[in-house]
Amino acid sequence: MFISSACAQSNEILVEHIKNASEHADRIFPPFDFVHFGSHFFWLAISFGLFYLFISRVIVPRIGDVIETRRDRIASDLDQAMRMKQEADTVVETYERKLAQARSQAHVIAQAAGEEIKQKVELERREIEASLEKKLKDAEKQIAKIRDKAMQNVGSIAEEAALEIVKKMIDVDVSRESVRSAVKAAGY
């Protein structure tokens, strides 16, 4: 079998490491060696003590200050929110009161305007009725005059028509007085 020189060297290094490992195999890893347990425990206690002092003296006060500041800020914000709520409640109450007053005033104004309009309409209606009544009376007078005039003309027309009819039908001349008395007796 053919072996390269690089492979041969790596085998030599491996053999050397195995020999060195067997020399150290009898030794224990120092943190797990119970002979040194006391010193390990001592340094553990000192490390945790220093860590505890650091946390209790530096970190916890800072966290406490942050919590206190936050609590004060929340309390301040809650107080401010309460004041703003009270202000908003008073503003809403004032708004509702003024709105109710405005509505009642608007109702009074609307009623007054309605009454005023009713009075104006009633006055105009009376004026129009009076005007129409006057025009109706004037028209009745004119109709009566026209009717009387027409009736007067009807009488004279009836007289002339009766004279003509009698003359044509009977071929007799009748006096105007007799025809007039006959037309009056007929109601014309």
From Swiss-Prot:
Q: Which domain of life is it from?
A: Bacteria
Q: Where in the cell is it found?
A: Cell inner membrane
Q: Which cysteines are joined by disulfide bonds?
A: none
Its membrane topology: Single-pass membrane protein
Q: Which GO terms describe its molecular function?
A: proton-transporting ATP synthase activity, rotational mechanism; proton-transporting ATPase activity, rotational mechanism
Annotated transmembrane regions: 35-55
A Gene Ontology cellular component where this protein is annotated is: proton-transporting ATP synthase complex
Q: Which UniProt keywords apply?
A: ATP synthesis, Cell inner membrane, Cell membrane, CF(0), Hydrogen ion transport, Ion transport, Membrane, Transmembrane, Transmembrane helix, Transport
List the InterPro entries. ATP_synth_b/b'su_bac/chlpt (IPR002146), ATP_synthase_B_chain (IPR050059)
Q: Name one Pfam family in it.
A: ATP-synt_B
Tell me which stretches of the chain form a coiled coil: none
Family recorded in the similarity comment: Belongs to the ATPase B chain family.
Subunit text: F-type ATPases have 2 components, F(1) - the catalytic core - and F(0) - the membrane proton channel. F(1) has five subunits: alpha(3), beta(3), gamma(1), delta(1), epsilon(1). F(0) has three main subunits: a(1), b(2) and c(10-14). The alpha and beta chains form an alternating ring which encloses part of the gamma chain. F(1) is attached to F(0) by a central stalk formed by the gamma and epsilon chains, while a peripheral stalk is formed by the delta and b chains.
What HAMAP family does the record tag this protein with?
ATP_synth_b_bprime
Q: What's its job?
A: F(1)F(0) ATP synthase produces ATP from ADP in the presence of a proton or sodium gradient. F-type ATPases consist of two structural domains, F(1) containing the extramembraneous catalytic core and F(0) containing the membrane proton channel, linked together by a central stalk and a peripheral stalk. During catalysis, ATP synthesis in the catalytic domain of F(1) is coupled via a rotary mechanism of the central stalk subunits to proton translocation.
| Protein name as catalogued | ATP synthase subunit b 1
